[in-house]
């Protein structure tokens, strides 16, 4: 035995497998304002006590490993370790628990969502002692939130850029999402924008394919945008997807969009990655571009109720990483979204201070200390009959995005856009007059359709369309 080993052994070092509870389960711990707090939904393996499982989560996502190591004595574990400070059973679920874990702020690099996620969810989700694990919520302390620049511009600056106030913004995803030539794509954009929409959008998987290279698309779309803008007198935009295979190529596309003078670009932030997203957000801030964020791949991560990461966490991560819009689901359309849960993370995106509210899935009070807000985008299977509900649910600070609900109009793209704009204006006026959109919504749409043949035709086409499936992700 070497002298160093003898010295360490004499100081009390004892090799062996760790009992995590002895070090990482601390029910008497009082959380600090600077702690990053996490709420995990755990499903331990049979025979594993919840206290041991919660302690293992805290250990494996902070300083711990499976065995005792002599280098533990070279640092202060009490200063740097994560702590499981509370465990509660999930009502109505067998062998599921919410484990609350506190992490010291010094564990995380300033301004890096990538490092935050690598630490908290990077390894522990494959831990054998757990059958399943889901990160339900994070509390980002004000001291850490201040290290992020957040959205490039935020809600108020976007409204000022667009000179549009007092109503939700209207958008449309161009369809078919793949296969159009750049010139025909630009034509579809023009028809939608001249009909009354504020934005049109590249679908998330439109980047630079053989049928439509990115530079051609950018050129034709810019021409369409400026033509519609000149005809209507309104500022228009199209979300040009800058997502690419490398960060260098992505930044080149963003720079070209800036040279063309368009107001907004787009990024697929989960498939592109947080590092790329933050870099693009910084570029947009410095160069006056709005940044639309698509959440492609989110359901792979967030849809299962007992394993993965809840979208409210991904939404918080996006607000820190940077984006002016993000898709959030609709509550009423074809995509997953329970009302109270959706409204919870919509508030986390828009508001400065959000109180803890378990009825909406918010586990911690969140103070963003004036980090700019993000506009929620409602899209997926919505049409004119949904307009009253969408206006009532999402309010003015939102983007209501109709793809098939615009392009599927029997008279074409421009009449489809007219129908949506008329429906929106009618709902906003009715709301401002004190009418109840939830109860009188259909009547409001019918009244507006009497003087808008485009809206009347849309109402007839989609009168029977519903997506009535039970949501998977409930409280």
UniProtKB/Swiss-Prot annotation:
Residue numbers of N-acetylproline PTMs? 3
Q: Which UniProt keywords apply?
A: Acetylation, Calvin cycle, Carbon dioxide fixation, Chloroplast, Disulfide bond, Lyase, Magnesium, Metal-binding, Methylation, Monooxygenase, Oxidoreductase, Photorespiration, Photosynthesis, Plastid
Q: What Gene3D superfamilies does the entry give?
A: Ribulose bisphosphate carboxylase, large subunit, C-terminal domain, RuBisCO large subunit, N-terminal domain
State one Pfam family annotation. RuBisCO_large
Q: Where is this site: Transition state stabilizer?
A: 334
Q: Cite the post-translational modification comment.
A: The disulfide bond which can form in the large chain dimeric partners within the hexadecamer appears to be associated with oxidative stress and protein turnover.
Catalytic residues in the record: 175 (proton acceptor), 294 (proton acceptor)
Complex and partners: Heterohexadecamer of 8 large chains and 8 small chains; disulfide-linked. The disulfide link is formed within the large subunit homodimers.
The further comment given in this record reads:
The basic functional RuBisCO is composed of a large chain homodimer in a 'head-to-tail' conformation. In form I RuBisCO this homodimer is arranged in a barrel-like tetramer with the small subunits forming a tetrameric 'cap' on each end of the 'barrel'.
Name recorded for this polypeptide: Ribulose bisphosphate carboxylase large chain
Which gene codes for it? rbcL
């Amino acid at each position: 035995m070497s002298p160093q080993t003898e010295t360490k052994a004499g100081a009390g070092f004892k090799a062996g497998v760790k009992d995590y509870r002895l070090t990482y389960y601390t029910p008497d711990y009082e959380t600090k304002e600077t702690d990053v707090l996490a709420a995990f939904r755990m499903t331990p393996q049979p025979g594993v006590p919840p206290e041991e499982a919660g302690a293992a989560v805290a250990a494996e996502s902070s300083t711990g490993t499976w065995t005792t190591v002599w280098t533990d004595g070279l640092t202060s574990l009490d200063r740097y370790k994560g702590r499981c400070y509370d465990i509660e059973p999930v009502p109505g679920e067998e062998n599921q628990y919410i484990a609350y874990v506190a992490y010291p702020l010094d564990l995380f690099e300033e301004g890096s969502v990538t490092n935050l996620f690598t630490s908290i969810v990077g390894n522990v989700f494959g831990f054998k002692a757990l059958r399943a694990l889901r990160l339900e919520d994070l509390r980002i302390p004000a001291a850490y939130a201040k290290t992020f620049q957040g959205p490039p511009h935020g809600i108020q600056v976007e409204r000022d850029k667009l000179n549009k106030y007092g109503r939700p913004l209207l958008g449309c995803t161009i369809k078919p999402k793949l296969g159009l030539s750049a010139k025909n794509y630009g034509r579809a954009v023009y028809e939608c924008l001249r009909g009354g929409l504020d934005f049109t959008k590249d679908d998330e998987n439109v980047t630079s394919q053989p049928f439509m290279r990115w530079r051609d698309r950018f050129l034709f779309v810019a021409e369409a945008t400026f033509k519609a803008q000149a005809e209507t007198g309104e500022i228009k935009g199209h979300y040009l997807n800058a997502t690419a295979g490398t960060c260098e190529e992505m930044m080149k596309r963003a720079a070209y969009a800036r040279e063309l003078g368009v107001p907004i670009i787009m990024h697929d932030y989960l498939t592109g990655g947080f590092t790329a997203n933050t870099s693009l957000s910084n570029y947009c801030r410095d160069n006056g571009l709005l940044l639309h964020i698509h959440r492609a791949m989110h359901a792979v991560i967030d849809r299962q109720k007992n394993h993965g990461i809840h979208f409210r966490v991904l939404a918080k991560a996006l607000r820190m990483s940077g984006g002016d819009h993000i898709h959030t689901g609709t509550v009423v359309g074809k995509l997953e979204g329970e009302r109270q849960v959706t409204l919870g993370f919509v508030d986390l995106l828009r508001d400065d201070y959000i109180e803890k509210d378990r009825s909406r899935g918010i586990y911690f009070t969140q103070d963003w200390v004036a980090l700019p807000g993000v506009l929620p985008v409602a899209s997926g299977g919505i049409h004119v009959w949904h307009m009253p509900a969408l206006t009532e649910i999402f309010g003015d600070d939102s983007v209501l995005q109709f793809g098939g609900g615009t392009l599927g109009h029997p008279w074409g793209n421009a009449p489809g856009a007219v129908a949506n704009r008329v429906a929106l204006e009618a709902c906003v006026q009715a709301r401002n007059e004190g009418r109840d959109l939830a109860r009188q919504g259909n009547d409001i749409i019918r009244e507006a359709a009497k003087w808008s043949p485009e809206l009347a035709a849309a109402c007839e086409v989609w009168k029977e369309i519903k997506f009535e499936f039970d949501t998977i992700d409930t409280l």
